[in-house]
Structure formats: structure tokens, C-alpha cells
Amino acid sequence: MSNNSLYYIYIDTKIKGAFEQLIRYFQSQVFNNKDCISVFCKYYKEIEHLAVEVFNKHNITFKFIKKNSDLSFIKGKIVFYLFNAQSNCRVVANRDLIHVFVTHGESHKLASVKPIIRIYDYVITSGDVGVDRYLKSGIFTQYDINNGKVLKLGDTFIGSNIFKYESNSHSLVYAPTWEGGVPEENYCSISMSIAKNIDKFCKKNNIKKIFIQPHPNLGHRDAKYRYYLNECIDFFF
């Protein structure tokens, strides 16, 4: 264990794309190996092989959590959370630690304003838009904001892709989100009607090429969305 050891990261998810999102935080130095004591990862058979492969590849210390007694923390340290999960509540119950919800991305979706966010000592947001979102939803009050419950961290965008802007390009990128963890949080735009509108737009604007980059979680809750995606791809061809 390094002398720099400051915090833990707790992750509870069966979604394989979540590990790619976590690694990007390390690659962009939001987190780093020296300061991170360990990533505590709730054990699921579905993600066991991937988690071992990813964490070992990037030299990140980790531990699978199969039962509550597997959790062991140094008093006074920080625990960061990137995803909301019921098991987070058990960890947050340890008041010898400081609990910070980072999220893995902000948006105006319902998932960004769930009441469970109140359980953490601090919540990270990018800026005033995020603060306003919490105030309007009633998750936090102005008193909470004034007393530092919500911390503005600035632009922490860590996404990466293969695309770059060219003013003379005749290409279009379509990057639909996934269907969400529950039907009420479904903001996915994949459908034949959308595909036809994209095709019409491309023809009108002399766009010759379409790049499609779906959300890594697409089809996790409802596999038919992968079928919808393939249907749209076939249509474009």
C-alpha cells in the first residue's frame, strides 16, 4: 500500500460497459493508482472474468465483495461511488468514512435526480446546471448548496472516441443512448422512424457516410434494442 493511499472506489453493477467507464477515470487522472487503496467490486459471476482482466491490465488493486464481512476500510478515508446501487447504502452506513457520489455522467434523465443521492456526504456535479437540476428536482435545498453538500468540479468529461471534427466532412455520427435500467428511464431513440429521418437529413445535406456508436449498455435490460439497432443498420445499407 502506498503512502499516498487516500480513497476507495465501490462499484456494484452487472453491466460490463461500466468497467470501461471506470477505467477512463483512471486514464484521465481523475483517479490514480497511487491514491486509490482498492476498488471494491460487488461479485457477480457475469462480470468476474472481465473485472479481473480489466483491473489487472491497468494495475488497479481490487477486491471482490461477496458478503458484507469482506468489506474492510481504513478509518477516515474516502469512498467514491460511480453508480447508484442498493448495496451502496450498507457502505454509507459506515460513518467512519467520507462518502462521495461522483456519477459516471450527468444528464437531464431521471437517473440523475434519484432521491438516493441524498445519502452521500458529498455529491459531485460539473457546474451550475447540475446544481440547478438538483434544486428544481427537490433533491437538495439551497441550504444544502450553501453548506457545500454539492461540489462543482468543472468539466470532467472523460469520454473518448475515434471521431474528430472536419469542416468539409460529409459524415454524420449517430450515438443513441441505451434503454435505461427501468422502463421509466428509457430515452433510447433507436427506431425505424428515427432511421428514416436520419436518412432524409443526410440526403438533404449531401452527407455520404453515417457512423453509429451505440451506448455500451444497449440491450442490457431489453435485448430487443440490439435487434432494433441491427434493423436500422440494415436500413442504412
Language model region names:
Residues 1, 27, 111-113:
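Short, flexible, solvent-exposed loop/turn segments with mixed acidic/basic and small polar residues
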Residues 1-5, 30-34, 70-76, 92-95, ...:
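Flexible, charged surface loops at secondary-structure boundaries
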Residues 2-15, 177:
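Nucleotide-activated donor-dependent transferases that construct or modify glycoconjugates
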Residues 4-8, 149, 170-172:
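Residues that mark the start of a beta-strand
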Residues 10-20, 38-159:
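Active-site and donor-binding regions of nucleotide-sugar-utilizing enzymes
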Residues 16-34, 156-231:
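Conserved catalytic-core segment of nucleotide-activated headgroup transferases in glycan assembly
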Residues 65-71, 222-237:
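Donor nucleotide-activated moiety binding/catalytic core segment of transferases
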Residues 141-145, 203-205, 234-236:
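Short helix-capping segments at alpha-helix termini
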